[in-house]
Amino acid sequence: MKLKASFILFLCLGLSAFAQENLTYQKPSKSILDLADFERAPSVSMDTKKEYMLLTYRNTYKTLDDLNQEEMRLGGLRINPVTNISSTVTYINNLKIRKINAKNETQVSGLPENPRISNLSWSPNETKIAFSHTTATGVELWVIDVATAKATKLTAANVNANLGNPFSWFKDNESILVKMLPKNRAALLDAKKDLPLGPIISNADGSKSQNRTYQDLLKNKNDEANFENIITSELYKVNINGATTLFKSADMYAGEDFSPDGNYLMVTTIEKPFSYIVPLNRFPSKTVVYDKEGKMVKTVNEVPLFEIMPKGFMATRTGKRSMNWRNDKPATLSFVEALDQGDPANKVDFRDEISLWNAPFDAAPTSMMKTKQRYGGIIWGNETTAIVVDQWYDTRNTKTYLINPSDANQAPKVISDRNSQDIYSDPGNFETIKNQYGKRVLAIENNNLFLIGAG
C-alpha cells in the first residue's frame, strides 16, 4: 500500500513538470532589444513656401494591441468594425514642427494621449494640418495650427475612415468635408448569432471570364448588409472652430475631390448590386459633381457592375474611367475611354482616347488625344504642355509623349520609347511643383522640363 502511494506521488510530481507554465510575453536582453527596437528617423513633409517642416514619428514595429484588433473582411476591405478604420493602418505616434531657419524642432502640443495618428492633410494655404486619431472606440478629427504647433480636437470619435480619404479641405482653409457615421446607424450583423438574411445564389450563365482569385469577397446576404453598413456615411462640413453642418445625406461614399479652384466637388458613390466574385472596385458606381454649397451640377459618370473582363493584362472596362480634375485648370475633368472595347485581342489603330470636359458640363466633352497603347497616366503642365504615358504589357513597351492639350491636331512627340523592365534606360521622373491651385504640375523653366532619376 505504501509502495502504491509512493508511486502515485511520484507520478503526480512527474506530471507537474509537464504542466503549462504561466508565462507572459518576454523581452530579450537590452543588447538584442537595442538592435531590433530602434527609434526610426522621422518622415518629413514640407510646405511649398519652404517655411515649415512636419516631422512624423512611428514605432519600428506594430504593437501587440494593433495585431490583436478585431478585423472584418468584406468586399476587398479589411477594417476594424469597432473603430471604423482599416485594420492595416500603420499609425504615427508623434508630431513635431520645425521652422526651416530654426535650429530645433517644436513638439506639437495638445496631442491626444497615446496618439494613433493617420490621414495627415495640409490645408490649401498650408497654415493648418488636419489628421485623424484612432481611439479605442472610433476615429476623431484633429487640426494643427502650424505657426503655433498646437493641436485641437474638432469631432468626437464618429469619423468613418473605412473607405477612401475620410476628409478633404474646402478651399476657404476654414472648413473640412468629413465622412461621419450616420446618426441612425444600425448594428452590424453577427454571423455567429444572426440568421442569414437570404440564401446564397450563384448564377452560371456560361459566360467566359478571366477573373483573378480575389481575397476578402462578400459571401452572403449578411456580408452584403454589413458591407453597406460600414461604408455608408453622412458628409459634414466641419469648421475649424468645431461647428458642424450636414452637407450631404447618408450614402455609400467612395471618394470626394474638390476642383482645383474649389468651386466644384466630384463625389463617387458605390451602387448596387454587389458581387460575390469581384471586389468593390468593380462594383457599380456613380460620379456626380456638386457646387461647393452641395447643389447638384451634373452626373458625369455611371459605371455598371463588371464581373466579366476580356482576357489579358491590358484588358479594361468600357465607358469612362480614370476621371480626374485637370490640375492646371480651374474646373476641367479629364477621362479615358477604351476604343477597343477593352479587349487586347481586338486589332485597332488606337487603344484609348483621352477627353476633356469643362465645368459646368453643359457642352459635350472634347477629344484631346488617342493612344496607340493602353493609357498609363498624365502629368499636366500648362495650357500648351502635358506629358502622357501609354504602355503594353505583352511587349513591355512604354512610351512617353509631349503633347499640347489645347490642340488635338498637333501630333504628340515621343520623348521616350523603351522597355519598361530596362531600368538602365529609365530617364527618371518629371519634376513637379505646386501651382496657384495647390496642385502638382510640371516644373517648366524657359520651355524646359526636368527629370530626376537614379542615373
Could you describe each region identified by the protein language model?
Residues 1-5, 19-20:
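Short, Lys/Arg-enriched, disordered terminal segments
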Residues 4-14:
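Sec-dependent N-terminal signal peptides
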Residues 12, 19-455:
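Beta-propeller folds
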